Regions:
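Feature 926 captures the class I aminoacyl-tRNA synthetase adenylation module centered on the KMSKS loop
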Residues: 7-39, 44-45, 49, 69-303
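Non-catalytic, structured segments within soluble enzyme domains
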Residues: 54-55, 59
Length: 303
């Protein structure tokens, strides 16, 4: 501070974020006498710099000390692998990198595409707000949940049939959506995992110099799709219920099941009729019948 004032005539920074101590897994202060110190270079050699950085940021709540657990570093490494594998999958489906996130939005986006774009749009607003308040742990927890669950476990699985079918007219829309959401996610994640996000970004956005000088994602009202969000969340809930029933009854994934959806609501009927394909891939359904009553449903059917 004194050097900056002397040389530049101004303070080098106006805000300082102070974190607590990093203790060992028993809550003890690290010291030479206890021999419980952790060499960060050893952690980096084993798990990578991003994993260590991510662990230290996510585990350190303001006003509290944190305990260092190797299992948390391993979990951070696993998250980095998840991001890497998802990115690799996306690039494999557009090996020549012809489809860019900067291209004009496709006119034939599906409900699933609009759902993930809307979820990302909300995430951008929340994460930006959290980071402006220096709530780094809260922001990255939301990022983690979105990337791991919404993007990887749900959306990528939803679009796989479209990606594997060259005749599907919405294949390009799926790839555009995948890249658009991934790039925004990489930008939000970059302060936490700078190395892996830089590597992936420069491969997908090869026309840009670096993620470090790219623009921060901005909330966009045109990416709000409330109806599509509601529709896909309804489908997700149904898929979860089917999966839970199958797990409770120890039904093997290879064994397909006939699924009945009983509802008097025309809106709900339309939601399911427009999303029948998801149940084959996500819920191992052989067929889905949407009807207004229980007519024709076997008495031994499970609900």
């Amino acid at each position: 501070v004194f050097s900056a004032m002397e040389q530049m005539g101004e303070v080098p920074f106006k805000t300082v974020l102070i974190h607590g101590l990093v203790r060992d897994d028993q809550g003890r202060k690290m010291s030479k006498s206890l021999g419980n110190g952790i060499d960060p270079l050893e952690v980096i050699d084993k798990y990578g710099a991003d994993a260590l950085r991510y662990t230290l940021i996510t585990g350190n709540a303001p006003g509290n000390d944190m305990r260092f657990y190797w299992s948390r570093v391993e979990a951070s490494r696993n998250f980095a692998n998840k991001v890497w594998n998802a990115s690799r999958f996306i690039m494999m489906n557009d090996p020549d990198n012809k489809i860019k996130a900067t291209d004009e939005r496709p006119a034939n986006l599906t409900d699933a595409d609009k759902w993930i774009l809307s979820k990302m749009n909300g995430l951008i607003k929340e994460v930006t707000d959290n980071m402006e308040k220096y709530e780094l742990g809260i922001a990255v927890a939301k990022l983690n949940d979105f990337i791991w669950e919404e993007f990887c476990d749900w959306y990528i699985e939803m679009v796989k049939p479209r990606l594997y079918n060259d005749a599907d007219e919405t294949k390009t829309a799926a790839i555009w959506t995948l890249k658009t959401v991934l790039i925004d996610a990489l930008k939000l994640l970059h302060p936490y995992m700078p190395f892996i996000t830089e590597e992936i970004f420069c491969n997908i956005q090869d026309e840009e110099e670096s993620i470090m000088i790219s623009s921060w994602p901005v909330y966009d009202e045109t990416n709000n799709f409330a109806a599509e969000e509601k529709a896909i969340e309804t489908i997700k809930e149904a898929v979860r219920n089917i999966r839970n029933l199958r797990a409770d009854m120890n039904v093997a994934p290879s064994r397909k099941a006939l699924v009945y959806v009983v509802t008097a609501s025309e809106d709900v009927k339309n939601i399911f009729n427009n999303s029948l394909g998801f149940f084959g891939t996500l819920a191992y359904a052989s067929e889905v019948k949407v009807q207004a009553d229980k007519a024709g449903i076997p008495e031994d059917a499970v609900s």
